[in-house]
Amino acid sequence: MLGAALRRCAVAATTWAGPRGLLHSARTPGPAAAIQSVRCYSHGSHETDEEFDARWVTYFNKPDIDAWELRKGINTLVTYDLVPEPKIIDAALRACRRLNDFASTVRILEAVKDKAGPHKEIYPYVIQELRPTLNELGISTPEELGLDKV
């Protein structure tokens, strides 16, 4: 079934109308070549969870991170289909504090709550793990600020 669909796509991609409206066909590779070209896209390197966490902690721990890089990192992290580990969030909150960007700290915590979705036990766990950092940096949660009622 997949081979037939790939062959149809390959033929459609190599057929064009000439100047008189006649259909012309370029020589198409066989079905094995078409399937092989699709499979080549999945041969990228795979990052382990530990490498992923280390990459993001390192990113947010850069001493010269600026506000644009911070927001870009937060936006990229939020697009992933996961709730970041508390150590990544800790590093991001510390970067926000270095830049005196309180709004981003609230945004990060709101994003974590949103990413947890229907799993109501995830957000309290993350806040529990981050509580020492939140207290140290003087950061209030959205609930403490009353933003959850707005």
Curated annotation (Swiss-Prot):
Name the predominant localization.
Answer: mitochondrion
Span of chain positions assigned to the transit peptide in the UniProt entry: 1-41
Q: Which UniProt keywords apply?
A: Acetylation, Heme, Iron, Membrane, Metal-binding, Mitochondrion, Mitochondrion inner membrane, Phosphoprotein, Transit peptide, Ubl conjugation
* Post-translational modification N6-acetyllysine, affected residues: K87, K113
Choose any GO biological process term that the UniProt entry carries and state it: mitochondrial electron transport, cytochrome c to oxygen
GO molecular function per UniProt: metal ion binding
Modification Phosphothreonine, positions: T141
PTM annotation, UniProt: In response to mitochondrial stress, the precursor protein is ubiquitinated by the SIFI complex in the cytoplasm before mitochondrial import, leading to its degradation. Within the SIFI complex, UBR4 initiates ubiquitin chain that are further elongated or branched by KCMF1.
Topology term for the membrane:
Peripheral membrane protein
- Give me the Gene Ontology terms describing cellular component: mitochondrial inner membrane; respiratory chain complex IV
User: Quaternary structure?
Assistant: Component of the cytochrome c oxidase (complex IV, CIV), a multisubunit enzyme composed of 14 subunits. The complex is composed of a catalytic core of 3 subunits MT-CO1, MT-CO2 and MT-CO3, encoded in the mitochondrial DNA, and 11 supernumerary subunits COX4I, COX5A, COX5B, COX6A, COX6B, COX6C, COX7A, COX7B, COX7C, COX8 and NDUFA4, which are encoded in the nuclear genome.
What is the purpose of this protein?
Answer: Component of the cytochrome c oxidase, the last enzyme in the mitochondrial electron transport chain which drives oxidative phosphorylation. The respiratory chain contains 3 multisubunit complexes succinate dehydrogenase (complex II, CII), ubiquinol-cytochrome c oxidoreductase (cytochrome b-c1 complex, complex III, CIII) and cytochrome c oxidase (complex IV, CIV), that cooperate to transfer electrons derived from NADH and succinate to molecular oxygen, creating an electrochemical gradient over the inner membrane that drives transmembrane transport and the ATP synthase.
Under which name does UniProt file this protein?
A: Cytochrome c oxidase subunit 5A, mitochondrial
